[in-house]
A protein has these predicted regions:
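Solvent-exposed strand-to-loop "edge" motifs in beta-rich extracellular domains
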Residues: 95-101, 124, 176, 198
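Extracellular ligand-binding interfaces
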Residues: 99-167, 206-209
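Extracellular/lumenal carbohydrate-interaction signature centered on repeated Trp-anchored short motifs
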Residues: 81-92, 162-165, 186
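Extracellular beta-strand ligand-recognition surfaces/modules
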Residues: 114-119, 151-152, 156-161, 165-203
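Short carbohydrate-recognition loop motifs
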Residues: 54-77
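Extracellular beta-strand elements of beta-rich domains used
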Residues: 32, 193, 212-215
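Extracellular carbohydrate-recognition regions
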Residues: 23-49
């Protein structure tokens, strides 16, 4: 994971973005069906490279339109500015699939802090929740891992290891409840979503897919 300047980059990027689609009971963040730019980035999103060159593409995996992330000793993310009131849309759902985990990855140590799939929910310049598919850390673990003063990034391990590797997994999280549990207060609006992959700490490689990211009413 990459925390320095996380929130500044999520909230202050100057890319002209397409609006989030709101339709009654849901707010579509992306279904990877929107047009892509000349560089292959979906409309409304920004590709941010931290270490090395990004290997991202919008693909069809069977009948699923998805964002494919490949990492070889690199770190990069796809991010979008959004505005979501969690009192109205508390549920975040998405599909993800990991086809290769970074060998030895474990977010609990800075030297091994690599994951094939991470979904950041940014609330401000100082607070975020990140849902991860880790190589080693146990499912259900929740920890503050930000090394930056005055910034809190709460990590929630949703998947770990190879048990479901190569399979599409559907996740649903009540982000409103998660925020109250992790921060002990009412959540502010969600300001940004970030999809990330990295393998530079372990010097390995990884691959994952994301699809159908949206917020829903309860």
């Amino acid at each position: 994971m990459s925390f320095p300047k996380l929130f500044q980059s999520v909230l202050l990027f100057v890319l002209i973005f397409a609006p989030t689609v709101q339709a009654g009971d849901s707010m579509i963040i992306t279904d990877f069906s929107s047009p892509v730019s000349a560089s292959g980035v979906p409309a409304g999103w920004e590709l941010k490279e931290k270490n090395g060159k990004a290997d991202f593409a919008v693909v069809k995996d069977g009948d699923i339109a998805a964002g494919r992330f490949r990492s070889a000793n690199t770190s990069y993310s796809l991010q979008k500015e959004v505005k979501v009131d969690l009192k109205q849309y508390p549920l975040l759902t998405w599909k993800w699939k990991v086809t290769k985990l970074p060998a030895g990855g474990d977010f609990r140590k800075s030297k091994t802090d690599d994951q094939a799939a991470q979904l950041f929910v940014a609330f401000s310049k100082t607070k975020a929740i990140v849902y991860i598919w880790d190589t080693t850390a146990p499912v259900g673990l929740m920890e503050d891992t930000s090394p930056v003063p005055f910034m809190t990034v709460m990590v929630v391990v949703l998947r770990s290891g190879t048990n479901e590797i190569g399979k599409w997994v559907v996740e649903t999280r009540n982000v409103y409840d998660d925020y109250k549990k992790l921060y002990g207060s009412e959540p502010p609006a969600v300001n940004g979503i970030r999809l990330q992959i990295n393998s530079q700490h372990t010097g390995t490689s990884a691959e994952s897919y994301f699809a159908d990211v949206l917020f829903k009413r309860q």
